[in-house]
Amino acid sequence: MKTSFISSMLCLLSLCLQAQHKSDSWNPDKGDSYANPIIYADYSDPDICRVGNDYYMTSSSFNHFPGLQILHSTDLVSWELIGAALTDYPGRGWDDSRPWDVLSPGMKQEGPVPGPDDWRTVPQHGCGVWAPAIRYHDGEFYIFCGDPDRGIFMVKTDDPYGKWDDPVWLVKAKGYIDPCPLWDSEGRAWLTHGCAGSRGGLKSVLFIAPMSEDGSRLLGSSRIIYDGHKTQPTIEGTKFYERDGYYYIFSPAGGVKTGWQTVLRAKSPYGPYQEKVVMAQGDSPVNGPHQGGWVETQNGEYWFVHFQDLDSYGRVVHLQPMTWKDGWPVIGEDEDGDGTGTPVTVYRKPDLPASGVFQPLESDEFETASLGLQWQFPAVPSPYWYYADAAGGTLRLYSVQQSSQWRNLWDTPNLVMQKFPSDRFTVTAKVSFTPNPQLKQKSENCGLVVMGDSYATLRLTDSHDGVRLQMVECMEAHKGTQEWVLFEKGLASESLPEPYSNVYMSGTVPPVAPLPYEECTVFLRAEIEPVPLDGNVPASECTFSYSLDGRRWHEVRSEEGTYKFKIRPGRWIGAKVGLYCNRHHSKNDSGWMDVDWFRISD
C-alpha cells in the first residue's frame, strides 16, 4: 500500500510538473500588468467558467485529437494545459440508425457525412468540434459542443484533470453549432445555439430549446429567438447567462477576422431580445475582437476572454476587463462613454492571488510513458502509431502505411503536431531514422513539418542508395496537389565538408555517400517569424536547417538564397508544427523514427 501510494503521488507530481510550463517563447505576465494575447496559441472560440478559486477554459478542436483540451488558471493570465475531454469520436452515444431530429430538403453539407471509421483513417479537416461551452453545475463539469454535420453533444466529469464521460448526443441535426446551456434561477434548463449556413442553408439566427436538468436531452424542439440578418450578420457562438432579472446571450457577429461582440438581453428566455454591440476593434490593433465568455471572479471583478484571428498563427486568446452600465456589459476600455469598448493590449492584472508564470506545454523531452498534453493528431489516434518510451526518453513513431487514395500530408492521419506558441520561435528536434530493410519498395520517410493547407517538411527518405535528406513543399495541399522536392542531399556518415553544395530540382541529383542505417541521427530545425503587413494581421514564414552533430548547422537554400516558406493556416485553424513517419507499401512490420527531444525556444 505504501509503495502504491508513493507511486501515485510521484505520477501526480509528474503530471503537475508537465502541465506547469514556463514558456521560452511567450510570456504575457508583466508583473503588475499583463499583455495580450494571454495565450499566443490557437485556442479557438474559447469559453471559461469558475469553480471556487479556479478557472477552466476549453476551445474548438475541430478534427484534432485529443479534442476539447482543458486549461486551468488561478489568475486568468497564466494558463496550464491539464487534459482533454474527447479522446474518441463520435463516441458510443452516437447512433447511425437513429433518425434525424432536424433535417429538411433545404439543408446541405460539404461532402458526405464522415462515418465513425473515417475519423480514424482520414483527417476530416474543419469538421467535428465547433465552439464549445464549459459550465459547472451541481458538482459536475459539463461541455456542450456542436458538430455541424451531426448535431449537439455533451460530455461531463467530476474531475477536469481526469477522464470525461462518453459523449451524449442531445439532438441529431445538420447545421446546429455553438451551443450553450443555462440552468436558471427558476430551476429550468435551457440550451441556445446557432446555425452553420454551410450545412443548414441558413445563418445569422439564434435558437433556444428547453433541456433536461441533467443536460442529457432536449425537452422540446429548438426555435428561432433572434434574427440578425439586418444588424448582426453572421451572429453565432452563443454564450447564455442570467443576471439581475435579465437573460443575456453573448454572441459574435460580423465575421471571424473583422467582427465585433454583440450582447442580447430579454426578460424571458424566448425574448423579445434587445441588442447592443459591447466591443469592437475601434482604433486598436486587435481585429475581430469577439467570441468568448465572461466570468465573475471571487473578488467581484468581471473579465471576458475572446479570440483574435491571426491567420497562420490561429485564433489567439485575449483577456479584457468588463464592467456593467445600465444593465449592459461594457468590454475593454470605453473612452468615449458610448457603451462599446475597444480591446486593451496592456492592462492591470486581475485582483487575484499571484500564481507561477507559465503557459501551455511546448517543448518535450519525452520522459513520460504517455504522450504530452500539447500533442494532437488530425484524426483519432491508433495505438499502432507511436510508443512513448519513458525509459529510453524517446518518442518512437512507426512508419504508418498510407491509404491508396493518399495525395499528400493533408491526407495523413498520423501527423503528431502542436499549436504555434508565439509569433516568433524556433523548433529543433533530434531524430533517428531506422527504415525497415525488408521493404523492397523503399517508401519510408519521416521528418519535421510546418503544416497548414500548404506545408513544408524537412524529410528523411529511405532509398536504394541509403537515407536522403529532402526539403519538400506542397502548396494548396487541401486541393490534392502534389509534393515538390526543392532540395535533396545524400547524407554522408562523416562530417559534411565546408562549404557544402545544394542540389536543386533543375538538374539530376549527383551520387553522394548515403548515411548508413545504423548512423541515421539528424537534427532538424525550423525558425518561424512574422512578416509585417499593412494591416493588423501578420503573415508568417519559416526557414529550415539541419545538422549532423547538433553544432554545425546547414541552412536550406534555394537558387534565390535562403529558402523561405510562406506559412498558411489550416481549415479553421492556425498552422501547426510537428512530426510524422510514413510508408506507402505494405509489409508486416515497419521502420520507425525515434525522437530524442523536441524543443521550442525564442
Located regions from the model:
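Hydrophobic h-region of N-terminal signal peptides that target proteins for export
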Residues: 10-19
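Positively charged n-region of N-terminal signal peptides that target proteins for export
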Residues: 1-5
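Carbohydrate-active catalytic/glycan-binding domains of CAZyme proteins
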Residues: 20-602
